[in-house]
Each structure stands twice: as structure tokens, then as C-alpha cells.
Amino acid sequence: VGSDAGATFIFIAGSIATELSFLLVGIGYVSFRSSFQVPIHVPDRDSVPALVGGLGMGFATAFLSLVSTDAVLPSVELSPGFMQYTNLAAPTGVGLVIAAVLSLALIGPVEEFFFRGVIQQRLRASFSARTAIGTAGLVFALFHLYPVPFLSPPIAVVAHMALYYSLMGGIFGWLFERTGTFVAPALAHGVFNAVVFVAPLFT
């Protein structure tokens, strides 16, 4: 698959294992709290502007992240362990297409079910929308940062990644709050990731 079938296999296996853990924990919580329900319904027409806006904000955030990365990375020294981690299991060629399909069918739906449908909605029952969205976004960032802090990266790199994932989590959280269904952020998350994965095929 692509130029490195091994990397693609590791990516697929790692993604499935990670998403399965999120799914099992989320289902376990919902099963334990019988009164807790995750809102699942197809977004209506009124949700389309929010979906488009959420995707737009996501791509804008990604663009600004890339621009700032080009400015930050040349000025810092990256450890060999961090460099090896960032290059680990990077899909190529057909692997990018597989990654895009996984994003739409698994990664987007499962992560939004867990981080927005379960975590954010549970927080929303006790706190304001801003607090719930922000806290769920931070938890989202924490899971995406692991195990980067243990690879001796510069503080600037950790801060940059934490800010990026927190903002993305906040965007998906806003979309969940705005539409009232985790299907909306799941769709936006999946489409966003899919576009990011297949974009290199056209460059």
C-alpha cells in the first residue's frame, strides 16, 4: 500500500485500537447511566450553515497551524525520539485513501460520540456551554497529545500542538452545541480528516 505497507498497517491497526477504546468506554458509561442519552439524529437544513461554518473554521485553524509550524520548528531543536514518533505509521499512497475512509467511517463518528456526545454532554448538565465545550476540548487535546510530552519536545512544540487540538475540539464542541446532535461534529470531523489525508495526493 503506497510506498510503505508496514506504516499503513500500523496506522490502521493503531487507529482501530484507539477508536475501539473510546467506543467501549463511551458505551460503558452510557450503559451504566441509564438516564443518559447521546443525541443521535440527522442534522436538519437549519444545521447546514453551522456545518459549513464549522468546517471552514477547522480548515482555517489547520492553515494557521501550518503557517505557525513553519515559523516555530526551524527555531527549535527536536529530539530524535520526537522526530521518530512524528514519522511513525504515516500512511502514503493508497494508504492515504484508506485513512480518509477510516476518518469518515470510524475516527470522526467514534471520537465525536466519546468527546462530545458523552464527555461534553455530561459536563453540559452541570456547567455552562462555554465551560463544557472548553473542558471537553482540553480533554480532546490531551488524548491527541499523548505521548508527545514524554519524548522531550520543546515547550513551544507542546504548546503549539495543545492549542491546535484544543481549538479543533472547541470547534467540534460548538457544532455539537449548536446542532444538538453528535452526528454534525462527527460528519465535520470525518470530512476534515479525510480532506487532510487525501490532499497530499493532489500536490
Question: Residues of each region from the PLM?
Answer:
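Juxtamembrane/transmembrane-helix boundary motifs at the membrane-water interface
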Residues: V1-G14, P74-E77, P149-V157, P200-T203
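Alpha-helical transmembrane segments in multi-pass membrane proteins
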Residues: V1-S34, N87-A90
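Juxtamembrane helix-loop-helix connectors linking adjacent transmembrane helices
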Residues: G2-F9, Q37-G108
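Alpha-helical transmembrane segments of multipass membrane proteins
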Residues: T18-F22, M57, T61-S65, M168, ...
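Proline-rich low-complexity regions
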Residues: S21-G26, F63, V67, P109, ...
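Residue-level signal for alpha-helical transmembrane segments in multi-pass membrane proteins
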Residues: L24-F32, F63, Y146, W174, ...
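Cytoplasmic juxtamembrane interface segments
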Residues: I27-D46, I171-W174, T179
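Transmembrane helix-loop-helix hairpins at the membrane interface
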Residues: G93-T203
